[in-house]
Amino acid sequence: MPFIFRALSQIPIPIAIQNAIFDHRRQFILIVVCCFFGMVWLFCSVSDETVGVFFSKKIKSKRLFLRILLLETEFIFWSAFLFAIGYWMYGHLLGNAQFLWEILILMLKWILLIMYQMACFQLYFGNRSFDSRVSEISGSVTICFLIAAVVQLIFVKNSLVPNLQSDFKIVAHRGSDGNNGVPNTVPTLKDSKKKLSPDYSELDVRQTVDGRFVVIHDAMLANSSGKEREVNNLSLGDLIEHKVKESGHAAYLSGYSQYLEVAHQIKQPLITEIKTDEHDNYDLAAEFCHLYADSMIDHGDMVHSMDYRIIVNVKKSEKRLKCGYVLPFEIFSMPKGAIDFYSIEYLTMNRSFIKAAHDQKKKVYVWTVNNKLDCLRACAIGADGVITDNGSKLKRFLKTATKDDFSLGCFINSYATLK
């Protein structure tokens, strides 16, 4: 799978298509899954004569499809089980026990993958001799894996650990720190500054119907009667009178001007994500820069967006304002030009992407990283920081991180992600 992603990342994809995929990524993933099972069904629907060429026993198309579907389901279930138990146990172990546990889990993942591939061969070609080879091959791979793991651990334990305290950035996702308030609100911003003092505080803004900007993540907002309305069809005055409740906290929405003023008063640098939808006019980037760019530049603030056209238009309006590209997954070619940094989703982060970004003198922040294991992986592959909901927790962890902790991060990245 990593090979496929790397191959796709070399193919230039038009920005308009990337934007469409990112904006509708849930539907895109659903379409990809449906296409996959559609291809499996077509493969299973060939004539009996053709089936006889590929299979030692003729299998009816429906029966074959169901067997393949069952095999895929079993593989996904056991992979998810190992992933879940690995993460759960990691939080309850210390020191070398963490290493031993991760080695065991990764070894089981390898064996599971081998057994899955063997089952595929047997299903496709009807060769039951593979059964007798599964344990033999699994054992050989396990021994090789353990030898490689020991060599890896010895090498990493004797390597230099980067200065995580000074170089690695903690970014408060939506301005929050744990469950300290309603995300994207002024009270939460102040509380996070007091308790965490993050390197940056990240937030989301949308343009209102009267051309102003409000601090909010979702495109829809429910009123007191429960009816949802689009944010870009409401005025700023209407929005700031709306009280938002979440996890036992309540706070009023705020305009971006107020939020920015408070952040500058408490000396909290910001990374502002400019949210858009299909109804927005891309002139909003110029309007945003006209209102806020000078003040943001003076205080070291930055912007990022999942819409590349917004980044381009911001740069056209104000070249000095640093802009980042938000990537929900990294499988396409890396765009060049207006970007100063990348914000990439942690599930698809990999060393090759970060190296390519660093070669272009661009930083990479990973989102949303909320546990120590993912933070270690981000450190190990060279990310410049993490966007997190648990900034205080990760900050304390990084201050006390040992060489063994960093070694575990390198080890997991090398063998778990294979990137």
Model-derived features: positions:
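Phosphate-group recognition and catalysis centered on beta-loop-alpha active-site segments
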Residues: 102-109, 120-419
